[in-house]
A protein has these predicted regions:
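Extracytoplasmic/secreted cell-surface and envelope-processing proteins
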Residues: 42-44, 84-87, 111-115
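Secretory targeting and sorting signals
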Residues: 1-27
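Residues in and immediately flanking transmembrane alpha helices
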Residues: 18, 50, 72, 118-120
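Serine-esterase "nucleophile elbow" of acetyl-processing enzymes
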Residues: 27-78
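Catalytic-core regions of hydrolytic enzymes
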Residues: 79-99
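Conserved phosphate-coordination/catalytic loops
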Residues: 57, 86, 138-142
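Alpha-helical cap/lid subdomain in secreted, periplasmic
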Residues: 92-143
Length: 143
């Protein structure tokens, strides 16, 4: 009887060990990297993440909102004022084989988007809005 109890206890312990080891590990949240310029960083929200940069990254930027809603681990590399070369030189290194999602918005600073806005916000007799738009459009078409 004692031997049978010992065998039953050993079998139960072995089964419990198998069940514990067969349990799936808690899956990590998907990794999401946000690249780009002020459109992605959240410039203009007036509520910025203190990360030691002048990138004006915000908890209200669309990447932050998506990551929060979906449960993604966010690495926001987007930076206010970034140009295409900045993404290539300083942001792409955030991507890895574990990156599940990527978003990017870039090109407005290269094309002179801010100049178009400031030019076209002036009275027509004082500025050349069409010329500013044409210049930006030419840049986009040639890129």
């Amino acid at each position: 009887m004692a031997r049978r109890r010992a065998l039953s206890t050993a079998a139960l312990a072995a089964t419990a060990a198998l069940v514990v080891s067969a349990a799936p590990a808690h899956a990590a949240n998907p990794s999401y990297v946000a690249l780009g310029d002020s459109y992605s960083s959240g410039t203009g929200t007036r509520s910025y993440i203190s990360d030691g940069t002048s990138c004006l990254r915000s908890v209200y930027a669309y990447p932050s909102l998506i990551a929060s809603a979906k449960g993604y681990d966010l690495n926001i590399r987007a930076c206010s004022g970034a140009k295409i070369a900045d993404v290539s030189n300083t942001q792409l290194s955030a991507l890895s084989s574990s990156t599940a999602y990527v978003s990017i918005s870039i090109g407005g600073n290269d094309a002179g988007f801010a100049s178009v806005l400031t030019t076209c916000a002036q009275p027509a007799w004082l500025s050349n809005c069409n010329g500013a738009i044409d210049k930006a459009q030419a840049y986009v078409n040639q890129t």
